[in-house]
C-alpha cells in the first residue's frame, strides 16, 4: 500500500513525546480568565529568575503597537477586562485583531504587556491574588517541567487566546527576514545521517532560506508540528515556516536511516532547537521523523518535543 499522510505519522512509533505538555495546556484552558492571566504572570516571573528572555524584534512590536496603546489609554478596570476578554476568547475588536497575529507577534505583545504591568502603565495582577486550587496544580505542573516544555506550554497558552471568526480570517505576520548569505552559513553534521535532503532541511531552516527549503518537499507533502495535526501542501507548509520558524537554531546531533516500503526512506534525527526568545539559554529536546519518497523529496516530517533528554538516544523502531 502506498504511504498516506496518516500512515506516515506512524513511522518510528516508539518516539516518546512530552504528552504532559498538551495535557497541561488542556488543564490551563479550563481555568477561568483571572486564573489564566495570573498563572501566566506567576510563571513568567518564575522563569525570569533563571532564564533571560530576549526582547521581541522591532517588526513584531510595530504590528502590536496600536493594540498596546489602546490598552494603555484605558482605565485600570477596562485594562483588566481587555486581558480577560483575550483569555475568554470574547468577540471584541481587540480579540479579533489579536487572533489575526502570528505566534511571534502574540508573544511580543504579552512580553511588552508584562513590562507595562511592571512599570505601572497597565493594571497588574492584584497584590496577594490567590490562585484557585486547580490553577495552583497547573502551576506546580509547569514548574516541574523542563525549561523547553515550560516554554511550549506558555507559548501555546497565549497563542490560543483571542477570537477567530473563521478559518479564512485575515492573517498578520511580521516581515520575513532575508535568508542568511550563503558564504556565511554553517553546515550541520549529523552522526549516522548523510542524506542530503535532511542535511539541506536543517541548513536552509537555520539560514531562514524558506523558499529553498520548501522545494525539498513533494507538492502534497506535510509537516507535523509538535502536538498538532499535519500541515499539508507546500503553500501551507511554507506559510508555517515564515510565520513560526524565523531565526530558529536547529542543532541536530545524531540519527538513523532505514528503508521503508515502496522505495521510501525513513530517517529519524534527534537534537536540540533554540528559539530567538531564549537563545542559548534553552535547548528544546526534539526529534525529527522524515519520510522521503523514492526521489528523495520530503513526503512527511514530524517534529516531536521529547519527553526527556534520554529520548535523544532512542532510535528503537
Curated annotation (Swiss-Prot):
Keywords: Antenna complex, Chromophore, Membrane, Photoreceptor protein, Phycobilisome, Receptor, Sensory transduction, Thylakoid. Changing residue 126 to V: <40% quenching, decreases stability of OCP-R, accelerates OCP-R to OCP-O reversion. GO terms for cellular component: phycobilisome; plasma membrane-derived thylakoid membrane. Transmembrane segments: none annotated. It is found in: Cellular thylakoid membrane. Proteolytically cleaved into a red 16.7 kDa form named red carotenoid-binding protein (RCP) which lacks 15 residues from the N-terminus and approximately 150 residues from the C-terminus. Acts as a blue-light photoreceptor and photo-protectant. Essential for inhibiting damaged induced by excess blue-green light via a process known as non-photochemical quenching (NPQ). In the dark or dim light the stable inactive form (OCP-O) is orange, upon illumination with blue-green light it converts to a metastable active red form (OCP-R), inducing energy dissipation, quenching cellular fluorescence via NPQ. One OCP-R molecule is sufficient to quench 1 phycobilisome. More OCP-R accumulates under high-light and low temperature; in the dark OCP-R spontaneously reverts to OCP-O. Monomer. Interacts with the APC core of the phycobilisome (PB), probably at a ratio of 1:1 in a light-independent manner; possibly only OCP-R binds to PBs. Interacts with FRP. Detachment from PBs is accelerated by FPR. This is Orange carotenoid-binding protein. It comes from Synechocystis sp. (strain ATCC 27184 / PCC 6803 / Kazusa).
